[in-house]
């Protein structure tokens, strides 16, 4: 039964992380009562900073979650958590990391962690906006909220991991660039 649950759970939880930018602990701690499979909305409660927020699922992710839920309801009809092990308890971070490594290493030689899916979510959204000509300033607030950040400052972290993003942002935002990405003071520099 372990392999059956793993083969059902791994594709769903990793696609959920990839498509929503959820923190890994948010996915692991997701209670069934916080997943609305009719409306396609996940309520994130009691997470980092206790910042409750909502995530709207893409139609394809919603369909996958509905199918997964039907199968899991046959095995664990009264489960508390959305993703559970054979003992009907939520998976832990070690399970998630080990399974991510197995899958990732089978198709990639570079190093990555499950949490990198969150980083990828932010980077892909930022790149898509700039390529499609969206107003960056309007979109960053939405991204920040959907990722559960309390402030835009938390979301700005992702700029440092997107090559050449500062020049793209300067071209896109001109007069607001200094507000979005302030100059680093000498005492704040990292060596």
Task: State what each model feature region is.
Residues 1-191:
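Conserved catalytic core of the tyrosine transesterase superfamily
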């Amino acid at each position: 039964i372990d392999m059956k649950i793993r083969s059902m759970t791994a594709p769903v939880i990793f696609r959920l992380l990839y498509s929503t930018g959820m923190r890994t602990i948010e996915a692991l701690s997701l209670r069934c009562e916080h997943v609305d499979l009719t409306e396609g909305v996940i309520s994130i409660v009691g997470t980092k900073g206790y910042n409750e927020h909502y995530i709207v699922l893409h139609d394809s992710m919603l369909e996958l979650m509905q199918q997964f839920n039907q199968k899991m309801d046959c095995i664990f009809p009264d489960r508390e958590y959305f993703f559970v092990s054979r003992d009907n308890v939520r998976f832990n971070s070690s399970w998630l990391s080990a399974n991510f490594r197995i899958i990732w290493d089978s198709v990639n030689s570079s190093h990555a962690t499950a949490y990198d899916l969150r980083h990828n979510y932010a980077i892909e959204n930022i790149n898509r906006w700039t390529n499609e000509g969206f107003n960056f300033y309007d979109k960053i607030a939405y991204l920040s909220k959907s990722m559960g950040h309390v402030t835009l400052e938390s979301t700005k972290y992702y700029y440092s991991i997107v090559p050449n993003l500062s020049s793209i942002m300067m071209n896109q935002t001109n007069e607001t660039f200094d507000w979005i990405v302030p100059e680093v003071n000498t005492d704040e520099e990292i060596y």
